[in-house]
Amino acid sequence: MVLVNGKTINLMKFKIVPIKGDASFRIFYRIILNNKTKIIVLSQKEKYKNLVAYSAINNFLNKNKILAPKLYSHNYKKGMIVIEDFGNLSFYNILSKRKNKFQIYKQLVDLLVKIQKIKPKRKVKNFFGKSHIIRNYSTQQLHKESDLFFDWYLPLIVKKKKSNIIKKKTKKILSSLYKRLNLPNSIFVHRDFHVQNLMKIRSKIGVIDSQDALI
């Protein structure tokens, strides 16, 4: 038995199915009861901060008419939230079976444009009033993102000695380019907008994995 939002729930009545997640420290389960489903999200790291961001940014998107999972209940101290289930049909699945992909990609690009037209808000609240501050995009953040290439991909295609040389030269060039950037910090950036994070929900497009958004 567990207590959720003041109600005692018998977990023995639920069917719980693990869901293959993304490359993160979150674990996902689908709970099924009377043919209705919800998603449990467990965070193994930065429990409170990570899950408040997850639900607060989803709430912000919903308020701006972008479909994102709603929060049903939470236990931030134990690193758990229960959210709306958008199913298994991602646009990755849809596109892999379609020959003519243009119209689908157009829909997705139109959605991206709509997201980037949202008036950004620094402080956002989740469905229960908990606050999250959306951070600015910075040159430091850009370096972190480009480092993923050096840490994960480059070692797979070249030997270590050569990899270190390429890394040093490329980082120097990137550093020079990043210094020239003028980051206005005036646009909402999802940062994980790709077909596996875009779900088909009847005639609509649902957006997931929005917790790392920046301005």
Model-derived segments and spans:
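A short, local hydrophobic-aromatic micro-motif
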Residues: 14-17, 69-72, 208
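Active-site acidic catalytic loop and adjacent metal/ATP-binding pocket
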Residues: 26-31, 40, 115-116, 174-215
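An alpha-helical support segment within catalytic cores of ATP-dependent transferases
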Residues: 120-122, 132-135, 140-141, 145-188
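Alpha-helix N-cap/loop-to-helix initiation residues
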Residues: 24, 47-50, 215
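ATP-binding glycine-rich phosphate-binding loop
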Residues: 11-32
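A short, low-complexity linker immediately N-terminal to eukaryotic Hanks-type protein kinase catalytic domains
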Residues: 3-13
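ATP-binding pocket architecture of kinase catalytic cores
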Residues: 29-144, 182
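Glycine-rich loop motifs involved in handling phospho/adenylate chemistry
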Residues: 16-20, 45, 137, 190
